[in-house]
Amino acid sequence: MKKYLKVVYLIFISTAAFAQSTPKYSNEFLNIGVGAKAFGMGNATIASCDDVTSGYWNPAGLVSLKDNIQLSFMHSAYLAGIANYDYGAFATKLDDRRALGVSIIRFSVDGIPNTLDLVRNGQIDYNRVTSFSASDYAFLLSYAQKTVVEGLTLGGNVKVIHRKAGQFTTAWGFGIDAGAQYKTKNKWQFGVMARDITSTFNAWKFSFTDAEKDVFTQTQNEIPKNSLEITLPQFILGAGKLFEVNNLIGFRAEVNTLINTDGQRNVLVSSKYFNLDPNLGIEADYKKAVFIRAGVGKFQRELDINNQKVITLQPNIGIGLKLGSLMLDYALTDIGDVSASLYSNMFSVRFSINKRETAK
């Protein structure tokens, strides 16, 4: 046991030391989240996720699919429509012990002005201003399986990342995630998710014409060079419980804690070695067909108008409606504009095919 603890300690210390020389917020678009159901609960879903979105949140949850096949889609807009965020996923049960999933995530900003050729020979010509898009893509292949331990499931992701900014730069990356869930007979649920467990990398390649390089030089800007970007591991711990009031009404509550290892961040518990960012959520359902959700997260320390330190947070609410094989979810984030973030409307749809027969 002592040897095991020493190994864990060395891993954390090594990661923390490496964090001092690696950028924070690498591949940050992968931390936004997917599914309006999860957003409505403040993204506290690591321990309880049991549908197609588990491929993103915790692949171990794919084993708990209640259907042979599930499809899910989500679209949302950020910054008054400047940025678009899209998600699509497919999951299927291979048998009673194994499941497979595929997820695609896209975050894009379109219509970015390219002003490198705005000034030529001292003359400004707006007709030479063009536009380009900056897009980030992630492709996740997920696998989950039950273990010999009753209630314990394991899962993992292999993910490929592609990022592009116009004709100027492209990047390809590769990473691995691993997750586990444990559910007890008295309806307690526990989960752990290790993202970028092998330190995901992005290999960036830049391409500029000689004329564009001259503009960088004349404006005293550094010309970007091909480089390798590393995303350090992050860990999410979750615990929750199901409550059944009667045959009609049920409740679910969960709390998660995100642990970052890429250096000090502005979160509730912050240090140069690791950071703790908690979030929690609740869900009430009626006949497993109508759902009401609420959650809170993104705790940050900020200075108010009086230059006093305060803690801000982001409250979310959501609803869900199940219509046969169709599940509709909606979430409104940052209710009352409590945090510095702008509120967003989230819509997602889930479609089930070939519902499995359950024993009575």
Report the location of each language-model feature.
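Sec-dependent signal peptide recognition
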Residues: K2-L10
